[in-house]
Amino acid sequence: MKIVVCIKQVVTREWQVRVNDAKTWVRDQDASWELNEPDAYALEEALRLKEKHGGEVIVVSAGPARVTQVIREALARGADRAIHVDGEHLAQADAFVAAEALAAAIKPENPDLVLTGLQSDDQGFAQVGVVLAEKLGVAHSTIIMDVQVNPSTGSGQGGDLKVKRELEGGWFQWVTMALPAVLTIQSGINTLRYATLKGIMGAKKKEIRNVPSAPPAALRQRITSIYVPSKAKQTKLVQGTPAEAAKELVKLLRDEARAI
């Protein structure tokens, strides 16, 4: 099987968020970066499928030069090779622009399966995976908690897979799909492995193919404003006799706090 995993570099959760002067994104020039956590689970699932069915795992990431940090990390964890879609404008690309850039790099590989994380930790729109499937012209399924692959017994692409989707209210859904396909992986689907010293050293010798991105396309989605929520705290003193105070408290909880 040839499995492609799309990964994204995001700021670390410990980094102190600062909004830029235009209030359209964060001021990330001095940020610390890490692999998007849902993508780490997608990578782990791909590595497990490779161990079971054979083949190779290719990681693809779109963004400026700094994304090679997470590409190297993915290679150290066990991916075989990588593709870097290089473009400074991709750092703040919307889902459509990002998916188009990824699709252009993935199509020539003709993969059996493409995995992405369910969503990114920084924006959380959960759109890139489904738009990517449309750009590649293959079926997709989202919020995946289990993957069972039945590869083709012949040469070339084919086969099918059975996936478990997480629904609302504790419900799950099993779906059977033909390959090739795109899946968006839910966090917690597996237990993550971490890079060993041998893996880190071996990653230095693995191929990272640099693919220049197409000229920047017009964004179809634009963030108009971003802000840090302010904390609002109000204290109200209820006076009167105990009976009067209790009656007033119940009224406040019902009408203002809507807690009862």
Residue ranges and their predicted role:
Residues 1-260:
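N-terminal glycine-rich FAD/FM-binding segment characteristic of electron-transfer flavoproteins
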